[in-house]
Amino acid sequence: MVKVSLDNVKLLVDVDKEPFFKPSSTTVGDILTKDALEFIVLLHRTFNNKRKQLLENRQVVQKKLDSGSYHLDFLPETANIRNDPTWQGPILAPGLINRSTEITGPPLRNMLINALNAPVNTYMTDFEDSASPTWNNMVYGQVNLYDAIRNQIDFDTPRKSYKLNGNVANLPTIIVRPRGWHMVEKHLYVDDEPISASIFDFGLYFYHNAKELIKLGKGPYFYLPKMEHHLEAKLWNDVFCVAQDYIGIPRGTIRATVLIETLPAAFQMEEIIYQLRQHSSGLNCGRWDYIFSTIKRLRNDPNHILPNRDQVTMTSPFMDAYVKRLINTCHRRGVHAMGGMAAQIPIKDDPAANEKAMTKVRNDKIRELTNGHDGSWVAHPALAPICNEVFINMGTPNQIYFIPENVVTAANLLETKIPNGEITTEGIVQNLDIGLQYMEAWLRGSGCVPINNLMEDAATAEVSRCQLYQWVKHGVTLKDTGEKVTPELTEKILKEQVERLSKASPLGDKNKFALAAKYFLPEIRGEKFSEFLTTLLYDEIVSTKATPTDLSKL
């Protein structure tokens, strides 16, 4: 066994040794063990320099795009990978053959139980965009998964008892989404810098649960977010190889589905599958983050200004091209092509509005099935039956055998002109309203927020922020008033929205709308542009102590 030193490793939180969710006896101390810390410290020390280099490369690309010296295209240096028809992904893994309906949500204990009890095939437990990364959310997410995998997650609240509907081996397959490469976990420092949040989330889950999941016959499986280059996928593959070797399980046991949710990654889909080869379980269309990334990377180009967010749909030219290329790529390489999120939630007090929303979900899933997707996402258990009803028409567990004939060019992926697209005052109001509501909830520790009958995550607020930055930067003209979008206009409407939302808040003066607005304002005035809202806001939810925990007592 490799000897790992914990010298210069600082854990800046107390480790709770008391069980929180009785009757389970699992504590945070059972997760943050000395041997688990040694494992994640080894991964961090081995791979963190490469992680930082790859993040710097993103900014190199951005500078080239901004200068006009480079346009996104398929990489000439990897043409041999794209042009070689002989390589394939691995044989489908147990528990991942039928993925027609996947449910997603943060690793809160009650939501985890509800998701595992839902009529779905797989469950993406999310440490990323639908979770606010407070220490408790992240570490108790690990506790909850540890207990679920061992059939000891049942618990009671004063209002309700939560119980699994049977043995977890017979329930939906768990797929964990760790935080992206750009994020860090500031409650644990290694060699004077915060540990990679990706390695923290992946490492703790894998170390404690990989062998238990193998016994169950399904896992360990992951979703990988926010990648922008195939070398970022190679980095994950290297992490997987070291992790599997370390605990003594065969390479290829891990499987990972990559979310194609950044514009640069859309030009490298085949390379991403290739880099993960023995660990690949396909690609997924992360629609809202993809829109966010498209605006972000093309934000300084006046030829790529998107209209009001409700006019950017999956049938918009650049979105349709990305979906078609993803399905064709995945099926040629023998892996799953997963559809995107239906964010709707039931509207209990308005049957007519609810029926309209559910019809929209059904039509969206029919479009995905017809295009060739092998399954799709839902945000709420009530939507699972709709997705099931649509995808049962495949007649098989997946439709990887179906390779749609289409040719998608680089120009197609960059076709952001939307016929009859408009930018209006209502578009500004909507972006500010949704962005503020999401950021305020996130600052209070909630990353999965119902807004206007949709279950929203961080991608929603990111689209709001990017659109407003872009509209101000390019001084677009509003269709309804003929007024130019200026920093003064967006600031004025922001103040109006903060006042309205603060007055309506059930928290009274304990709401965090003013704090959210403080961070939002420079972005929507076009004065600065942060890579991610979550990293911009993160320090507000970090709660460290001055004296590190004595690791010898773990």
UniProtKB/Swiss-Prot annotation:
Pfam families: MS_C, MS_N, MS_TIM-barrel. Pathway: Carbohydrate metabolism; glyoxylate cycle; (S)-malate from isocitrate: step 2/2. PROSITE patterns: MALATE_SYNTHASE (PS00510). One of its GO terms (molecular function) is malate synthase activity. It catalyses: glyoxylate + acetyl-CoA + H2O = (S)-malate + CoA + H(+). One of its GO terms (biological process) is tricarboxylic acid cycle. Belongs to the malate synthase family. This is Malate synthase 1. It comes from Saccharomyces cerevisiae (strain YJM789). The lineage of its organism: Eukaryota, Fungi, Dikarya, Ascomycota, Saccharomycotina.
